[in-house]
Regions:
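Short, intrinsically disordered, charge-balanced linker/junction segments flanking boundaries
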Residues: 15, 210-213
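N-terminal small/polar loop signature for handling phosphorylated ligands or for N-terminal nucleophile
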Residues: 1-48, 146-206
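Gly/Ser/Thr-enriched, mixed-charge loops and adjacent short helices
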Residues: 49-185
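Residue-level signal for short segments within beta-strands and strand-turn junctions
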Residues: 55, 208-210
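Short, function-defining helix-loop hinge/capping sites that tune catalysis or transport
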Residues: 138, 206-208
């Protein structure tokens, strides 16, 4: 996508690593971009990898805007009409730009600023977290650290990004099956809370002990 944009004279700003979809929405406004694009299967099976488009306001585009984009796509030959720039050449020319770390740090801070309550006793919270082989690990751990949550155990099989979702074919943390690895780890660690985020980290699921084992 960045190479196509660059080839058409549009500057593309990219995070240096995989980051959550909300961090893209933030970056669109933070950097004053005209639009944002995220390629993701979200909480769906890997075969449904898709294309999320955001407007200049950082919100997902409306159906009307999507229909206009689709109409433009249908006018071109996807084999012959698509321009593609060389990545390194486009970067050297300033058409592909790496987003500065401050953008992500300010995003985490903005999320932190929305906290409710004074956080009393939160430093004693024992937590198991799973990013479900997605993008949430970096931002979630940074946020938890800011909140004072230090007793965090990450589900090892689901810690690193893997677009095939090998441990969880349907990675929706609102569904018990998606949280199974986390629940199994909870049986060993006995935390106060299990937290899971879907692969693009824009929805979460939680579980707490019910006192029945």
């Amino acid at each position: 996508t960045a190479r196509v944009l660059a080839a058409n004279g549009i500057t593309a700003c990219m995070y240096p690593r995989l980051e959550p979809t909300p961090a893209l929405s933030w970056a669109v406004r933070y950097l004053g971009c005209g639009a944002g694009v995220c390629v993701t299967a979200s909480h769906n099976p890997a075969k449904y990898n898709g294309y999320k488009v955001y407007g200049a306001d950082g919100c997902q585009i409306t159906l009307e805007a999507a229909e206009k984009i689709l109409a433009a796509i249908e006018k071109i030959d996807c084999f012959d009409d698509v321009r593609l720039a060389d990545f390194d050449a486009a970067a050297a020319a300033g058409r592909i730009v790496t987003i500065d770390e401050k953008c992500l740090d300010d995003f985490v801070q903005a999320v932190y600023d929305q906290r409710v309550g004074d956080g009393a006793g939160i430093d004693a919270l024992k937590l198991v977290y799973t990013p479900l082989n997605g993008t949430g690990l970096e931002c979630v751990k940074k946020l938890l650290k800011k909140l004072g949550v230090t007793h965090v155990t990450v589900v090892p099989e689901q810690e690193k990004p893997d677009g095939d979702f090998p441990t969880c074919p349907y990675p929706n943390p609102e569904i018990r099956e998606a949280m199974q690895k986390g629940l199994e780890l909870c049986d060993k660690v006995r935390p106060d809370l299990l937290l899971g985020t879907d692969p693009d980290c824009d929805r979460c699921g939680t579980a707490v002990p019910d006192g029945k084992g």
